[in-house]
């Protein structure tokens, strides 16, 4: 038998997803090491070291269910943190937290792996000049532009179009920036993960015939997984994204759905690890854990990772420590509105609630800034007049206010746009609208150059030329 120098220990205690493992004197694995445990039925469980307890024991968190584990089972120190496959072979596939494919499409032939725990880029590697990341979506680029290498919070309830917006962004970054996307499903519903996968195949974001031509890699750790998996799956997705940025020198979109579940999983494990809970029962290390994840998402001189994170707000309380800690890291927010979705205005991005730190003179052009402010002003005035219209009717408004309402309704409709991934639903071909065309279009509407066009001409079109052409067909 070949002699191996693997460091072995045995399980001494199991408390739910947390277990203690004893090693021989002087052979303690460092924190974040991966340890493999093989059960009687030959199934493997990977656990990650969280604490060194003294007496040659470590406390670890399991990435799989601990059902069937018993004390005395052998544990093998793998000598490294959890390593996951990276690079082009990951495209079009679904992985779990430890980098195993879970889509029943056969094994993944990969050349490289990377550890999920890595340092954030050094200051000298960072791209310091803020630049806008053009998405081709009018409402986003004009009113709440994304920062290249920034972090965006995506807020919205069920059924207002989060998934379709995410898929359109994946599609547009591939076409316009030659970039790829990584989707991290953190602690959300398995059904939603499956629906997203099926929709991506339908819309061509995932190419089943040739996975290498797909535009996205998927990493899932859903609600039914133990907290260890949900706590680490975000890091697995981030590691795959970092490879595309640092080695392939691409612009990468990283989606995390949902960032709150990352915090929630950490709080589930925290008490079992014997840590004193802090405010509202969250882990005392909440800000540190969030910072370790978020600081790795950034622009370097090689490429960028722009992250879009769905944010669940527990009980709609924005002061809850979990969302409050997340907000500190965000550069922009995209808020989806049920009211707009009910009107059929898609994408249902709320133009008054969505914000961005990029919308300031010096980063965007003066023309862009002035147009965006003018659009918001017009929509805000329309919002204020709606009560009067509802009670007295539009005829009771002054001439000036009636003109404002007419333009605001055109602006509202012009903020809608046909998506490439929604062609099946809308029957209209998708449109990518450049920032230049977007600004030009809204300027023309606000300056009154198109007051004689019917408002229906502005609904679900790309640039302003299409609206003018559509008006001709409506005559």
UniProtKB/Swiss-Prot annotation:
Belongs to the ATPase alpha/beta chains family. Its main location: plastid. The keyword Membrane applies. Its EC number is 7.1.2.2. GO terms for cellular component: chloroplast thylakoid membrane; mitochondrion; proton-transporting ATP synthase complex. This is ATP synthase subunit beta, chloroplastic. It catalyses: ATP + H2O + 4 H(+)(in) = ADP + phosphate + 5 H(+)(out). NCBIfam families: atpD (TIGR01039). It is found in: Plastid, Chloroplast thylakoid membrane. The gene is atpB. Produces ATP from ADP in the presence of a proton gradient across the membrane. The catalytic sites are hosted primarily by the beta subunits. Keywords: ATP synthesis, ATP-binding, CF(1), Chloroplast, Hydrogen ion transport, Ion transport, Membrane, Nucleotide-binding, Plastid, Thylakoid, Translocase, Transport. GO terms for molecular function: ATP binding; ATP hydrolysis activity; proton-transporting ATP synthase activity, rotational mechanism. It is a peripheral membrane protein. It is an enzyme of class 7 (translocase). GO terms for biological process: proton motive force-driven mitochondrial ATP synthesis. F-type ATPases have 2 components, CF(1) - the catalytic core - and CF(0) - the membrane proton channel. CF(1) has five subunits: alpha(3), beta(3), gamma(1), delta(1), epsilon(1). CF(0) has four main subunits: a(1), b(1), b'(1) and c(9-12). ATP binds at residues 156-163.
């Amino acid at each position: 038998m070949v002699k191996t120098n693997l460091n072995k220990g045995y399980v001494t205690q199991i408390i739910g997803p947390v277990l203690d493992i004893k090693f021989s004197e002087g052979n303690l694995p460092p924190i974040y090491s991966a340890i493999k445990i093989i059960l009687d039925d030959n199934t493997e469980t990977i656990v990650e070291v969280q604490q060194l307890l003294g007496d040659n024991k470590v406390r670890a968190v399991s990435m799989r269910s601990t059902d069937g584990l018993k004390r005395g089972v052998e544990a093998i120190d793998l000598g490294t943190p959890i390593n996951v496959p990276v690079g082009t072979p990951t495209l079009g596939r679904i992985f779990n937290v430890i980098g195993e494919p879970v889509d029943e499409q056969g094994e993944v032939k990969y050349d490289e792996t990377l550890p999920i725990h890595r340092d954030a880029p050094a200051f000298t590697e960072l791209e310091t000049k803020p630049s806008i990341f053009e998405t081709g979506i009018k409402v986003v680029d004009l009113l709440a532009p994304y920062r290249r290498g920034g972090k965006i919070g995506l807020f919205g309830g069920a059924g207002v179009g989060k998934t379709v917006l995410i898929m359109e962004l994946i599609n547009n970054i591939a076409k316009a920036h030659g970039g790829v996307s990584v989707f991290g499903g953190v602690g959300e519903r398995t059904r939603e993960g499956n629906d997203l996968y099926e929709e991506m195949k339908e819309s061509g974001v995932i190419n089943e015939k040739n996975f290498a031509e797909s535009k996205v890699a998927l990493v899932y750790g859903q609600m039914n997984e133990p907290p260890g998996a949900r706590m680490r799956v975000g890091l697995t997705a981030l590691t795959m994204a970092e490879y595309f940025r640092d080695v392939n020198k691409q612009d990468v979109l990283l989606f995390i759905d949902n960032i709150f579940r990352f915090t929630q999983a950490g709080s589930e494990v925290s008490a079992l690890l014997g840590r004193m809970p802090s405010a509202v029962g969250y882990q005392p290390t909440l800000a540190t854990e969030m910072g370790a994840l978020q600081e790795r998402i950034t622009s370097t001189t090689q490429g960028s990772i722009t992250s879009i994170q769905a944010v669940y707000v527990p009980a709609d309380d924005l002061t809850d420590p979990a969302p409050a800690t997340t907000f500190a890291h965000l550069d922009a927010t995209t808020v989806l509105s049920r009211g707009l979705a009910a009107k059929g205005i898609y994408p249902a991005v709320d133009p008054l609630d969505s914000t961005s730190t990029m919308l300031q003179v010096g980063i965007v052009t003066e023309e862009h800034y002035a147009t965006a402010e003018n659009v918001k002003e017009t929509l805000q005035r329309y919002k204020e007049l709606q009560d009067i219209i509802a009670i007295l009717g539009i005829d009771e408004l002054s001439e000036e206010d009636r003109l404002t309402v007419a333009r605001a309704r055109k602006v509202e409709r012009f903020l809608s746009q046909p998506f490439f991934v929604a062609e099946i639903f809308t029957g209209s071909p998708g449109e990518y609208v450049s920032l230049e065309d977007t600004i030009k279009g809204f300027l023309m509407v606000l300056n009154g150059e198109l007051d004689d066009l019917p408002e229906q001409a502005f609904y679900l079109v790309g640039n302003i030329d299409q609206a003018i052409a559509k008006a001709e067909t409506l005559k």
